[in-house]
UniProtKB/Swiss-Prot annotation:
Plays a central role during spermatogenesis by repressing transposable elements and preventing their mobilization, which is essential for the germline integrity. Acts via the piRNA metabolic process, which mediates the repression of transposable elements during meiosis by forming complexes composed of piRNAs and Piwi proteins and governs the methylation and subsequent repression of transposons. Its association with pi-bodies suggests a participation in the primary piRNAs metabolic process. This is Ankyrin repeat, SAM and basic leucine zipper domain-containing protein 1. It comes from the Eukaryota. GO terms for biological process: cell differentiation; male meiotic nuclear division; regulatory ncRNA-mediated gene silencing; spermatogenesis; transposable element silencing. Pfam families: Ank (PF00023), Ank_2 (PF12796), SAM_2 (PF07647). The modification Phosphoserine is found at S17, S18, S20. It is found in: Cytoplasm. GO terms for cellular component: pi-body.
């Protein structure tokens, strides 16, 4: 009887040889007795490989059978120290995760700082399956704030991979929104880096701090701009979600109910469709009456610095009309100020600047001040007077007022320095006039000569007129 059983194992179901890809693991085709007998004959390592294959392919029946055999534990470790639950989470198989958890698998297991929850959040699968896995793990007290060796938490992995509902569920379960990894990245930074707009909006709504910098001093908005996610850059630079922090006041159950029934994209697209953002490029074009060029420049990722250094052929290449080119080139000519590295020059070299060059510098500096005044006036006219007309909630007003106060101080310092410059020029002028060794300029010499010539001519004419009168008088006598 045993011999017949062994012969039965030689050929798998369907007439295929035992060397086939399935290796006879067709559930329900061979009888239970023959499968268990074959399982007992397999070495432990080979059985573990079969178990791993069943986990990765989602063969729940085979997993249950191997667990029931008693040879493999639900918390057994395979190569690299992974447990069955970690394998199931890595493929986002929610059914397997549930089965293993019901069998007593440890949801808080970790290997080299790699937790099962992190594995689930970074799994390759649909967001629906990943969400179910994460929800199951959290229900078994998995800690959402345990970080990996790179100090990345589950919410960072979920934000990086674009799983909006997973991010919201983690926050509702106690995940810290503003935790930073070894590079200073937060979940918001990761979402901005990868271009996940819906997650950026959701994180702002959940209280994420957009002003936290990375270790190299970059804000999430700058990370988004560097990776060419301009819409996210504008959102993070000029606006905040009007519902920022609102969900933090709700209970865990209310939050979960709200976040799982809200479509962030649909809810927020209309909110941000009408906001106006003012950057250096927008202000510059607005001052020239070229607002229609803004979208074109943004589409081609052209910054104000690049615009100021463009040549005429580059304007044509980028689709600028001749009239627009003339406006921009004229403005560039007015703004052009030759930088003089005074700190690198010797004292003698500093004195070689001509009066014309210095006057030209002052004139251009005055024009730039005028442009700055115009830019501020444009901003003032665009800002709504009534706070109720502001569609989006801004950051703390103290940030704006503090910057304005600093700007006022800088303007006052500039005014003081210009007054000092004026006094110095006046002092130099007075000293030059009183200096006996002063050599008059050619213009001054020519003016003095012209005065002498005029006086000489008047004197000659006077003598001539006097001589003419005297002559007439003598002739009459």
């Amino acid at each position: 009887m045993a011999a017949s059983a062994l012969r039965g194992l030689a050929v798998a179901g369907g007439g295929e040889s035992s060397e086939s890809e399935d290796d006879g693991w067709e559930i329900g085709y061979l009888d239970r007795t023959s499968q268990k007998l074959k399982g007992q004959m397999l070495p432990i390592e080979e059985k573990k490989e079969k178990f791993k294959k069943a986990l990765t392919t989602g063969d729940v029946s085979l997993v249950l059978e191997l667990l029931d055999s008693g040879i493999i534990s639900v918390d057994a470790t395979f190569r690299y120290g992974w447990t069955p639950l970690m394998y199931a989470a890595s493929v986002a198989n929610a059914e397997l995760v549930r089965v293993l958890l019901d069998r007593g698998a440890n949801a808080s297991f970790e290997k080299d700082k790699q937790t099962i929850l992190i594995t689930a959040c970074s799994a390759h699968g649909s967001e629906e399956q990943i969400l179910k896995c994460v929800e199951l793990l959290l229900s078994r007290n998995a800690d959402p704030n345990v970080a990996c060796r790179r100090l990345m938490t589950p919410i960072m992995y979920a934000a990086r991979d674009g799983h909006t509902q997973v991010v919201a569920l983690l926050v509702a379960s106690g995940a810290e929104v503003n935790t930073q990894d070894e590079n200073g990245y937060t979940a918001l930074t990761w979402a901005a880096r990868q271009g996940h707009k819906s997650i950026v909006l959701k994180l702002l709504e959940l209280g994420a701090n957009k002003m936290l910098q990375t270790k190299d001093g970059k804000l999430p908005s700058e990370i988004a701009k560097r990776n060419k996610h301009h819409e996210i850059f504008n959102l993070l630079t000029f606006t905040l979600n009007p519902l920022e922090g609102k969900l933090q006041q709700l209970t865990k159950e209310e939050t979960i109910c709200k976040i799982l029934t809200t479509d962030s994209d649909r809810e927020n697209d209309h909110i941000f469709s009408s906001y106006a953002a003012f950057g250096d490029l927008e202000v510059f074009l607005h001052g020239l009456g070229l607002e229609h060029m803004t979208d074109l420049l943004k589409e081609r990722d052209i910054t104000l610095r690049q615009l100021l250094t463009m040549r005429e052929d580059e304007f044509t290449k980028n689709g600028f009309t001749s009239k627009d080119q003339q406006k921009i080139l004229a403005a560039l000519k007015e703004l052009e100020v030759e930088e003089i590295p005074f700190g690198e020059l010797s004292e003698e070299a500093k004195l070689e600047i001509s009066g014309d060059e210095f006057l030209n510098f002052l004139l251009k500096l005055n024009k730039q001040c005028g442009h700055l005044i115009t830019a501020v006036q444009n901003i003032i006219t665009e800002l709504p007077v009534n706070s109720q007309k502001i569609a989006l909630e801004w950051a703390s007003p103290q940030n704006f007022t503090s910057v304005c106060e600093e700007l006022v101080n800088n303007v006052e310092d500039l005014s003081e320095e210009v007054c000092n410059l004026k006094d110095l020029i006046q002092k130099l002028q007075n000293e030059r006039e009183n200096d006996p060794t002063h050599i008059p300029l050619r213009e001054e010499v020519s003016t003095w000569n012209s005065r002498i010539l005029k006086r000489t001519a008047i004197t000659v004419c006077g003598f001539g007129f006097l001589f003419f009168i005297c002559k007439i008088t003598f002739q009459r006598k």
